[in-house]
Amino acid sequence: MRRFSAATTLLLAAACAVHPRGEREERDRADAVARELDAEAPTLPDAPTLEDCLRVAFYANADLRARYWEWRAALERIPQEASPPNAVLSFSYLFGGPQMTAWDRTTLGIANEPGAMIPVPSKLATAGRRALEEARAAGLRFEAAKFGVQARVRTRYVDLALHAVMIEVQKESLDLLALAEGEAAARVRAGTAPMQELLAARSARDLAQSESESLHGQHATLAAEMNALLGRAADAPLPLPTAMPPSRELPGTDAEILALAGERSPEIAALSREVAGREEALELARAQRIPDFGLSFDVMGSATQSLGGMIVLPLRVEAIRGAIEEARASLRAAEAAREQARRDLAASFVLELYVLRNDERQAALFESVLLPRAELAARTAAATFAAGRGTASELVAARRTALDARLALAELRAQREKALVAIETSTKLDVEALHPVSLGDWRGR
């Protein structure tokens, strides 16, 4: 059996991969996500809340699953990169010649695959680490895609809620314009107003009616966009929300939020993993100076046993130098891309924080001062009109001012929520707890 020990060693070496440290943990994370994705998907209720839409989108969004499978594909490249070449078994049989047994006429051989030399283990380890960093980057991009889906669902839900407010405000405006038209018609009949006043009132009501119909038509477009995120048919019924989602507070100062941007951004983290992978690629290019080798072992019956080997001399000095410089340039490009991404993220954060704080200030002004004042003026005009001391035009003007203030407040709240979603997405923040949101936490939100 000892004559086959070398052959057995070659076979075992060919079957083993050099697994980098951290691969098992990355695979465990991917397996945990797979169990989440394969769980039974929740059903969307007839009148879904924002939380219902978020839960359904996690299971149904195809883009999120595509990112997951890209992550798994990157993980499966690790053993491919970190494995030695295949072994080749050869067989030959000698015909004719002196009297020999069948075994002595037989030659068995094992060698590395032709055209694929055996790299030293350090090369395989470096290649495995490079593939692991690429897999980690893919995993972080899945994380970014998860928060991207959450952001798109939140944004579209806010758009739907704002659309519901716009439809309600437009309906009340139509009622007011109908009242104004009725008063204008009465005044024309009484001879106290020209016909032009009635025509103007009718035109205003017709334009408002057309705008109302346009708003109802836009509902189908917004619903189709949300249905796409939820993995439903584009024309599946989706009612408008009954109210704007409650405002969520952003804890911490602006300086703290800006600091978190660079620390928790999944895109920056993915770029950092790509930089680490390029560093391993540079090490792999330098390792081309280390010769690869080949081994062979042959047994000719009971007559002879031979062990052979070969070595590849790294004489292509300029080619190796070029590969090293290419890897170094690629590393510098990845570092520059990461630095620019950090700068762009910081700039976008300054903008989003400005939008958020400015909308907060304006919303507070409308909520505490302008809207109550406009509603008080509308109630006063209504009381004056009921007492016969005011006109319908005055009532309509006062009430429409209150409706405009109500719509402006809803728009400010929607803009603030979108700015908060952008901050939340880039930093993986749970604004209620100010910590990274885990996958399980997000499912239950």
What is the predicted role of each segment?
Residues E40-P45, S90-K123, A127, L240-P251, ...:
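Small/polar, glycine/serine/threonine/aspartate-rich low-complexity segments that form flexible
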Residues M1-A14:
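Sec-dependent bacterial lipoprotein signal peptides
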Residues V18, L124, L140-L260, E352-V355, ...:
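Periplasmic alpha-helical coiled-coil/stalk elements that build and connect Gram-negative outer-membrane
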Residues V56-A66, R72-A87, M100-T101, N112-R130, ...:
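A glycine-/polar-enriched beta->alpha junction
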Residues A17-R21, A408-R445:
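Acidic, low-complexity, intrinsically disordered peripheral segments
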Residues C53, A60, R67, M117, ...:
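Amphipathic alpha-helical coiled-coil segments and their boundaries
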Residues V188-T192, F385-R389, S426-K428:
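A short glycine-centered flexible hinge/capping loop motif at secondary-structure junctions
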Residues C16-N86, A234, L240-A276, E339-R342, ...:
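Bacterial Sec-pathway N-terminal export signals of envelope proteins
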